[in-house]
Amino acid sequence: MDAVPAGAVDEPIDAPDPLVNGGGEDLDRRRVGEVELEKVSVVPMAASLFGGRVAAGFVDVADEASIERMIADCLGAFGRINVLHNNVGVSLAGGDAPVEDITADAFDRVTSINLRGMVLACKHALPSMRAQRRGVIVNISSMAAWSSYPYVAYKTSKAGVIALTEQLAYANARYGIRANVILPGLMNTPMAIESRVGLDGKTREEVIAERDSRVPLGRKMGTAWDIAHAAVWLASDKAGFITGVALPVDGGASVRRG
C-alpha cells in the first residue's frame, strides 16, 4: 500500500460522509484511502481526507440492485450521503475498439460501467440528498470526450458523463445539490499504461515517454493525486458556488495548439 505523501492533504474536507463509487485503481485509492477490491484493505488516508470513518464493499455498477444496496448500506451506516463520487471506468479491458471493429456486447459492457452505472448511482442517492437539501456529486469523465480518441465506447460514454453532470446540476440546484465533472488528461495509472504496453510493439518505457511528451506542463503525465485534489476541492464548501462545470485536469494538453 502507498503512504500518503507529505503535504498531500492540507486539511479534511468540509463536506463529510462521501460515497466513492470505485476503488481499485490508483485514482480511486488517492481519493478515499487505499481500497483494493481484491483484498478490501483500507489505510488511514481516508480519515485524513474526510476526517471520519471509512467502509469498503463490493459493488457491481452494471447491476442496479447492487447499486441500490450500496446506497442503502451507506445510509444505514452513516445516516446521510453528502458527497457522491462516481469514478468507475473501463476502456480496452472491457473490449473497447474503433467504431468499425466494436462488438455490440463490448459497447454495451463499457457504456454500462462508464455511464449507466453513474446514472443509477445518482438515481438512488439523490432522494436522500434532496431530503437533506444538500449534496455534492463529483463525476469522472475524461479528456477523451473532447479530443480525438480511437476507441468508440469509452469516448461516447465519457461524453455522456459530461451531459449527465450538466443535467444533474440544473435539475437539482433548487435542492442545494451541486454536480461537477472532472476530465482527467494523460495520467500515469495502471489502467492507462498497462493496457497499452505491447500495442504496436511498444514497451512500457516507450508508452510512458510518448504520453509524457504530449503534456505541456512539465512534460510529464499527471498522477492520481492531481485528480484527488480536484475532486476533494469540488466536494468541499470552498467550491460552494460552482456547479455544472467540466474541469480539465490535464497539464494544459487541452489548450495545446499545433
Set out the residue ranges of the language-model regions.
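Short C-terminal tail/terminal secondary-structure segment
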Residues: S91, G95-D96, T243-G258
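C-terminal helical subdomain
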Residues: V181, R204-K238, I242, V249-G251
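Short, small/polar-rich loop/turn modules that mediate ligand/substrate recognition or access, typified
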Residues: A173, R178, I242-G244
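Alpha-helical segment proximal to the catalytic Tyr-Lys
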Residues: P127, Y170-A171, G240
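Active-site helix of classical SDR
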Residues: C122, S157, T165
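Residue(s) in the substrate-gating loop at a strand-loop-helix junction
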Residues: S142
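Substrate-binding pocket helix/loop in short-chain dehydrogenase/reductase
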Residues: G95-V99, T103-D108, R211
